[in-house]
Curated annotation (Swiss-Prot):
This is NADH-ubiquinone oxidoreductase chain 1. The keyword Hydrolase does not apply. The gene is MT-ND1. Keywords: Electron transport, Membrane, Mitochondrion, Mitochondrion inner membrane, NAD, Respiratory chain, Translocase, Transmembrane, Transmembrane helix, Transport, Ubiquinone. It is an enzyme of class 7 (translocase). It comes from Equus asinus. It is found in: Mitochondrion inner membrane.
Length: 318
């Protein structure tokens, strides 16, 4: 039964990822005053299926000088970790109800760095290695602020369980009392998922395609799936943290619809940002984090710690 539940989680994720690529191309197309894909199937609806078929029936080429085992393991690890992060997400019921669900997700997103690093190193290409090193530095840096923002939210929620956040936000979304944290969280998730304007790992002008430059066919598709699964997962996480939907045990469908609509809006805003903003310079990216976000998040975290002590003389609850 558990394996059936796992499959019922994985298959919709992969379908959502497939059609997110189509939505992205359509949105970018309309924002640039063109149609986007509209030939394969009605309104281009079969385009993701055609793309998947094309990628998976091609021969997966590999550089002669590459480290074979790591070169193959890296994309598999990337997709496995991307799918594993969905386990504790309450939609409205998680696959496994974890006590430390939030810490589990943070740990898994940290491990995703290894797949990027290994892929860049195993390719034995200087472009891939530079892209991988950039990705690692960027991901590790932005995880610092993500962790501090999470801690601040947990101090308001009082638990490390994601399901508790639904109860916390029954009367008021956490985006209202903590909107500076929500803004910084959203920008940090953009950087964490290597999306524009922070897609310096794939800087076409200087790095061709970044850490996956030597990958083709199936392994490239696995990286692609992992990236888009992470985007949807991060937006679901944002919705759970700051835009909690009302949950009635008698009508869980209403929660799921509400939840999905909010996640879809956030995902579309990711694509809107990609169409609107140019890429950051690397030093500006690091400056934004270490000089702006980190002091602000630390100050707000201290505020959340001291508030219950000042007002009610009780220690912060987690």
């Amino acid at each position: 039964m558990f394996m059936i539940n796992v499959l019922l989680l994985i298959i919709p994720i992969l379908l959502a990822v497939a059609f997110l690529t189509l939505v992205e191309r359509k949105i970018l197309g309309y924002m640039q005053l063109r149609k986007g894909p509209n030939i394969v199937g009605p309104y281009g609806l079969l385009q993701p299926i055609a793309d998947a078929l094309k990628l998976f029936i091609k021969e997966p080429l590999q550089p002669l000088t590459s480290s074979t085992s790591m070169f193959i393991i890296a994309p598999i690890l990337a997709l496995t970790l991307a799918l594993t992060m969905w386990i504790p997400l309450p939609m409205p019921y998680p696959l496994i109800n974890m006590n430390l669900g939030i810490l589990f997700m943070l740990a898994m997103s940290s491990l995703a760095v290894y797949s990027i690093l290994w892929s860049g190193w195993a390719s034995n290409s200087k472009y891939a290695l530079i892209g991988a090193l950039r990705a690692v530095a960027q991901t590790i840096s932005y995880e610092v602020t993500l962790a501090i923002i999470l801690l601040s939210v947990l101090l308001m929620s009082g638990s490390f369980t994601l399901s508790t956040l639904i109860i916390t936000q029954e009367y008021l979304w956490l985006i209202f009392p903590s909107w500076p944290l929500a803004m910084m969280w959203f920008i940090s998730t953009l950087a964490e998922t290597n999306r524009a304007p922070f897609d310096l790992t794939e800087g076409e002008s200087e790095l061709v395609s970044g850490f996956n430059v030597e990958y083709a066919a199936g392994p490239f598709a696995l990286f692609f799936l992992a990236e888009y699964a992470n985007i949807i997962m991060m937006n679901i996480f944002t919705t759970t943290l700051f835009l909690g939907a009302f949950h009635s045990p008698y009508l869980p469908e209403l929660y799921s619809i509400n939840f999905t609509m909010k996640t879809l809006l956030l995902t579309c805003s990711f694509l809107w940002i990609r169409a609107s903003y140019p890429r950051f310079r690397y030093d500006q990216l690091m400056h934004l984090l270490w000089k702006n976000f980190l002091p602000l998040t630390l100050a707000l975290c201290m505020w959340h710690v001291s508030l219950p002590i000042m007002l009610s003389s009780i220690p912060p609850q987690t």
